[in-house]
Structures are given as C-alpha cells and as structure tokens.
Amino acid sequence: MAYHSFLVEPISCHAWNKDRTQIAICPNNHEVHIYEKSGAKWTKVHELKEHNGQVTGIDWAPESNRIVTCGTDRNAYVWTLKGRTWKPTLVILRINRAARCVRWAPNENKFAVGSGSRVISICYFEQENDWWVCKHIKKPIRSTVLSLDWHPNNVLLAAGSCDFKCRIFSAYIKEVEERPAPTPWGSKMPFGELMFESSSSCGWVHGVCFSASGSRVAWVSHDSTVCLADADKKMAVATLASETLPLLALTFITDNSLVAAGHDCFPVLFTYDAAAGMLSFGGRLDVPKQSSQRGLTARERFQNLDKKASSEGGTAAGAGLDSLHKNSVSQISVLSGGKAKCSQFCTTGMDGGMSIWDVKSLESALKDLKIK
C-alpha cells in the first residue's frame, strides 16, 4: 500500500493514462491537474483550465490518449495533446443542468455523460462537420444520473441515478459502429433501448460497474446496500445490506469479487457466489498496524477533553481514523490486471490523497481474506 497526499483540497475525480505514469485529478474546482511520477515523487506537469464550473468527471482514453472532462457548467471538453500542450474541443451536451459523470466507450469512438437533466448524452465525432455531436437517452430516467459504466461490447451502458435505480441502456450509434451481436442482456439493441432496470432500493445509486465478461453488473446505493445482477441467471439480483456507511464507488477485481469504498474512508471486499446467487462481505482491506498503547496521565486526559472533546489521545480531525484515507473515498480505478484479474487498484479521496493497493500484498497481510 502506497499513499500520496497531493493537496489540501479534496480530490473529486481522477483518471490515469495508459502506462500509469500520469494521473489527472480535479482539486474540487474548475481545473484539472496532471501529475507525472518521477522516481518516488509526483510532479505537476499540466493544468487544464477551460471549464468555468466545477469539474465533476474525468476519463482518459488509453489508446487515443485523449482526455474528456465534464462539469457543472453543463459542458464537456475533449482534450488532445499537441506537442506539450493540451488543446480543448468544446462538446455541446444540450443539457440545462450540471453534468455529473463521463466515460469513454471501450473503443474510444464515443463517450457518455450523465447529468442532472435526467438524460444521458452519448457523444460521437461527426467527420463530415468536424464536430462532436450528441444523442440523448431520456426515458425512463427520473432524476440525476450519478454514475456510468460501459459494457465490453461498446454498446451497452449501465447508469445509476438518484431515482434509486440501476439501468442498462443500448447506446448503439449506427454512424460509428457495426450492428452489435446478441448478449445475455438482450438481442435487440436500438439506441436508447432499456435492457435492464433494477427494482426500487432506498438510496441514490452512487456507483455502477460491469464485470470483465459483461454478464454481471454491480451497484452501490446510499442506503449502504451492494447489489449484483447476473444476466446468465435471468438477470437475478443479489442484494447485501452492508454494515458500512454509504459506499460511493466500486469496481470488479475478478468476476466474483468486488472492491467498494465510500464514507468509511477505507475499501472493503465483497464476494459473489454464483451457485447460490448470493453476495457476502469479504472483509475490510485497510487494517491498521497496531501501535503500542501507553496510559494517559491525568494532565493529558484533561488536555484532550479541552482540545478535542475526547479523553483519548490522537483524535484530532482525521488523526483518529485508523485508515490510510482520512476522509471519504470518492473514486476507485483498476491500475493493472484489468477487472478480470486485478493486481493493483487506486483510490482517491476527499482528504486530497491517493492510495495504491496491491491485491497480493493485501491477501498475505490479511489472514482471512480470500479473493476468488
């Protein structure tokens, strides 16, 4: 486990380049900062300044090396590296509320933007007019779209929203791709077709993720539940009410294992038993090292009561948390190995820090941890 603190400000979103030597982060404002690793240090090499509202989503296309950003100014920008400068291209999303999240499609020929306008904008490049255009997926979304993830086939798109639903839509754009082959989620996939809709839960859907095979989709809600739908089992949904505070982000690290994190400030593991169709809690992945405890003198106890409203030592803001992150984890991304067999993943948080987690090291450090 490696932790690096970039900022005093929260990191609201991040994205990595292809070879993982650079990371783009938003310091909770209208800018995007790109850091490059040199030895053990991270050095700021670029600042992307075009939005006039807070940046809410970043994604970095690995093959084309283009960055897409969206923000509360209701716009998206596609950034292209020319020489040593990132040049922005405005994408008109045709929305009247803030954009909330953005994701490149796997083939990098289009991207999706979720927004507070109760629509998903599917944007693609029109060669004839030399311009980015978008189509809207509207029905039956009834509230802000908070999270998006693409199916490996480049057509299906999972969306989590504030109307307590996880849905899968077809985002087939005939102008830029061939007709898709049938999937376990369905065979007919015209643009905007609703392929799956979860039954009502009791919370906003903060994060959504497809498995590497695309036959499973998982999501986390504000009521601290984790859900998984399996297309190979007639879209049966497994639900687990976790004991954590609400989770904000998740990712598959194998086809049967999920890592999620949120307001508890540390990642947790969930495993899926396909035979039983059940989710189970796999354990906390951030177990603190036990430090030697010594008794407090009466003087120290009264000082702590006066300064920190606590009689225990080390409970200043953030200092009392026995986790690497000292505030909510806002995003998780797979660093190496992919979703099928992840070997490293990354978390960024509202404490302005980034943690890199090694799966094998976690397995050896935690005796009861079993990643299937």
From Swiss-Prot:
Cell location: Cytoplasm, Cytoskeleton; Nucleus
Signal peptide residues on this chain, from the entry's feature table: none
UniProt keyword annotation of Repeat present: yes
CC annotations in GO: actin cytoskeleton; Arp2/3 protein complex; cytosol; extracellular exosome; focal adhesion; nucleus; tubulobulbar complex
WD-type repeats, residues: 6-45, 50-89, 94-135, 140-179, 242-280, 324-367
GO terms (BP aspect): Arp2/3 complex-mediated actin nucleation; response to estradiol; response to estrogen
Keywords (A to Z) from UniProt: Actin-binding, Cytoplasm, Cytoskeleton, Disease variant, Nucleus, Repeat, WD repeat
Domain of life: Eukaryota
GO molecular function: actin binding; protein-containing complex binding; structural constituent of cytoskeleton
SMART domains from the UniProt entry: WD40 (SM00320)
InterPro entries (alphabetical): ARPC1 (IPR017383), WD40/YVTN_repeat-like_dom_sf (IPR015943), WD40_repeat_dom_sf (IPR036322), WD40_rpt (IPR001680)
Gene3D superfamilies: YVTN repeat-like/Quinoprotein amine dehydrogenase
Predominant location: cytoplasm
Family: Belongs to the WD repeat ARPC1 family.
Disease the record associates with this protein: Immunodeficiency 71 with inflammatory disease and congenital thrombocytopenia: An autosomal recessive disorder characterized by platelet abnormalities, vasculitis, eosinophilia, and predisposition to inflammatory diseases.
Its job: Component of the Arp2/3 complex, a multiprotein complex that mediates actin polymerization upon stimulation by nucleation-promoting factor (NPF). The Arp2/3 complex mediates the formation of branched actin networks in the cytoplasm, providing the force for cell motility. In addition to its role in the cytoplasmic cytoskeleton, the Arp2/3 complex also promotes actin polymerization in the nucleus, thereby regulating gene transcription and repair of damaged DNA.
Subunit note: Component of the Arp2/3 complex composed of ACTR2/ARP2, ACTR3/ARP3, ARPC1B/p41-ARC, ARPC2/p34-ARC, ARPC3/p21-ARC, ARPC4/p20-ARC and ARPC5/p16-ARC.
PANTHER family in UniProt: ACTIN-RELATED PROTEIN 2/3 COMPLEX SUBUNIT 1, ACTIN-RELATED PROTEIN 2_3 COMPLEX SUBUNIT 1B
Protein name: Actin-related protein 2/3 complex subunit 1B
Species name: Homo sapiens
Lineage, uppermost ranks: Eukaryota, Metazoa, Chordata, Craniata, Vertebrata
Gene name in the database record: ARPC1B
